[in-house]
């Protein structure tokens, strides 16, 4: 039993851990050896188990193994000693063939199948099992792939080795007697040698830990015809046996040289094929798990028909890093190519702006125009295009000036002038209506036209009465309160010559109406009351006339009143720069009386003389160009407009457009109420047939047909709508700060309805002037015409909402709906009353002004702390009076430490209402007891005053 091999030591010497003991026991079962953890084996059993575990040679062990023939044992020992240990072998039938030569071959085959039963291997069936994927081989610099021709050459050399070994076995049969006694000892020594070789392999593995390990291929090919030829071709050979390791070294060198040549030809190395999946249990296996260094070992045995081929693709791993670099380089190249596309070449907005700034400074690449024509209403991007500037530079310049705009916002005249100064441009502002106007007929005879005279002046100075006297019709009596509410235009004949008069309101609210009257006039007549002199609206009228560059004639009215001083009036006008003719000046001062009619003929003659001097002419042929003086809605006729023609002729049936309104002239009525068919220059008429009420001051253009008129009106409507949106988005820094500060601003929603467009415009402007930092009027809707139920629905959900009507009255249904919605409707006939009513409403919503009135002062001389009551200060009144219940400040060292109300005031032990100067008193404050000697009480009253607008 001393020669028995312990299983645990056997496992340890194999280089395996005790955890892998179970795997060794399972492998022992495969060869018919039943083992347990503490069992021991004979050296013969240990040798067979070692061969099976290490080399893969499967030799079955019988449960009751018979005594072996000494000759056969001797032959086995000789074979073991003569042949080096192969790296991988399979159980073969060849040793049984050498046992008895006299036995026939079929009998040997049967015995062979009985001794080592194994699954039948079909011809050329291969199964690949990858059981050692993570391990890498110890062999370095192995070739890449094994071709079929190389395998055939290796087979031929291995067959020659097999034949030489069979001849060597015959020579060793004669020495069986001498080696019989040492059979058992040799087996033990062989086992020990094998164990020592395993240890050497483990040491070799440790020394090659840093080397990439490769997986081996075991290709097993079964061919019955080759087997029969091998059995019958036993020949003697006295040549020395060449080791398989040396043969493989030669093969390896040949393959490496061929691989180098192939690598030079092809840039991309061939990739190893994927391992096929085992589909069939009957197919043979190619084991990937055996990892060996084949140097110095025989890899072939004459007793087996298997060939062990190693994965010789080390060149792939050596070039792996280079392949990754090339792949990354290819990816980078592709990315660079993709960036060179037409979209990526376009730079961002910032990059474009930077480039263009450089170009703008370079006069050779970008030239800025010195003089350009800019429309009166132009967008930011249009200005940049016309001025040949960078859009970003224009927006940046406006931003630096405190105006935040977008490229679609409109620029006003001030902004255009600032930009022109910043970029050193000469600009000429053009009228925006030129693009909508039809070119005038250049071929034609200009004929004399009547002068257009505008009467302007201060309110109640007698403008309408004077014009009424001229027309012999008392129009002023029909006006509410005797005040003209909107423009009136009339034709007057004098000495067979016609004069067109335009009457403008004198109230301050109608400033824009006076401005329009001055723009369409040829001569301005300024009416001044001799008993009142020059007033605010008089100065304003003079400024409008001066801006329109029209001559001015002064009419000194109310000369019939006693104690009038015309020289004083002339002196006041001279101070304004308007010197009379009799004082050596250029301006006519005509004394008139609208009440008696004195001086009217002299005034008309002066107007005609001035017109003759001016030589007023116009072309009567061609399409008409007129100015809308006033627009309104009349019952039964719809939208109507009072127009005065400047050039051409307007006839019934002509198509036209005025701003957003368009239509065809249905009827024309003069100032006398008569129907007319044609309207020539400087003539005034009331026309019908409009799609909507045109704004006062708009230009009416005659066109060829309705389609053109509609198209131009729609185009203008779109333009104005975009302009309105631009105004809503364009905000300056100051406006933005004001919006943030006025977050608690009270708004009064208002709807304004008037009889005419001019009156509506004047009311809106007057109401907006009443806005202040606390209360503001918000006009949510305005229009010409009566109050409707839709107007009520707009303000039904708003608090403090008001509907204002001027010269209109609501119907019964509208009044009932207003009560239902709790909406206030206020109607007026005089603009004074409307503005004053809204001013009172705003004042009621505004918080009053609080003022303080100082009443007295007392100094603290001593303090008394009374339990459950508080601190009472003994004081002496030093100024004024101290009263109970009044507000007081407690001042300590000049600093107010408390403000409250005097809760109790006593004189000795008596409660008093007030204490005068020089007397002592006791003061107790409400909810404050931190009073010290030396403090001062200062009493005051709060006086509330109403705000004024």
From Swiss-Prot:
One of its GO terms (molecular function) is GTPase activity. Residues 457-464 are annotated as: G1. It comes from Helicobacter pylori (strain J99 / ATCC 700824) (Campylobacter pylori J99). It is found in: Cytoplasm. This is Translation initiation factor IF-2. It comes from the Bacteria. Residues 209-220 have a biased composition (Basic residues). Residues 448-617 form the tr-type G domain.
